[in-house]
Amino acid sequence: MDKLCYLPKHPDIKLYQSDELFKINTDTEVLGEFLNIYKEDIVLDMGTNTGALMLYANMFHPKKIIGLEINSKALVLAKKNMELNNITNYELINDDIITYTNELVDVIICNPPYFKTKEDNKSNDSYKNLAKHESELKLDLLVKSISRNLKDNGTLFFLYLTSRLDEVVLEFKKNNLVIKEMKFVYDTNKEYSNVCLFRAVKNGIQGLVVDKPVIIKRDK
C-alpha cells in the first residue's frame, strides 16, 4: 500500500512511498540538499526510483527533468509523485542505466547502490537489494554511462561510500569527470564518514574544494 509522506524539511512537497520499493533515507536527503541547478538546465536523475530526487531538482525550476529507472513499478509511483506536485516539465524512461543513451544533458544526479555484493547475496535479486548492492550496476559501467550522457562542462551530483573513495576518483578520472567539490557526511553514532558527496564536471578545469562536512544527528 502506498503511503503519503513529504520530503524532509520540505513539508509542502509530498510524495508517495511503498513498502515494496526502496524508500528515501538520509542519503536521499543530503544529496537533494547538495544540488545546485540552473533554470536552463536539462536534468537527468539516473535510478530515480519513485522520483524523490526529481522533486529536489524541481525546486530549482529547471527546463526539464528526466527520470531514468529500470523498475517499472517504481516509475508508476514516480509519475504519481510528479502529478501530486503539479510538475509538468518531466519525462520518465524505463531503461537500463548501463546501456542508456539519449540526448546529452546539463546535469546528472545519481544516488547509486554502493555496497559490494557478497557471494551469498547474489541470488537475492529483490528490488530493495538491488537498490543497495551493486550486483547489476558496477561502478565502472555506471560512470561510463554518466560520462556518455553528460554534455561537456555538464555537472554530476553523486553520492557514494567514503570507504570506496579511491575507486570513485579512479573511475571519474578514466571518464573525464573532474571532481570540483567534495563533502563528507558524518553520522553522530559513528566516528568516521560513511558516505561522501561529489560535484564533478565533465572535462572541467582542475581545482577541488573540500567543503565543511554534513553532520547527521541521530538519537543514541
Residue ranges and their predicted role:
Residues 175-219:
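Class I S-adenosyl-L-methionine
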Residues 30, 76, 80-87, 126, ...:
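SAM-dependent transferase fold signal centered on methyltransferase-like domains
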Residues 26-33, 76, 95, 137-144, ...:
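Short, contiguous clusters of charged residues that form electrostatic/catalytic patches at enzyme active sites
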Residues 2-42, 48-59, 196-199, 203, ...:
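SAM-dependent Rossmann-like transferase core, predominantly class I methyltransferases
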Residues 33-121:
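Conserved SAM/SAH cofactor-binding pocket of Class I
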Residues 14-16, 20, 136-193:
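Conserved Class I SAM-dependent methyltransferase catalytic core
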Residues 22, 26, 48, 65, ...:
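Residues at secondary-structure transition points
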Residues 112-141:
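Mobile active-site "lid"/loop adjacent to the S-adenosyl-L-methionine
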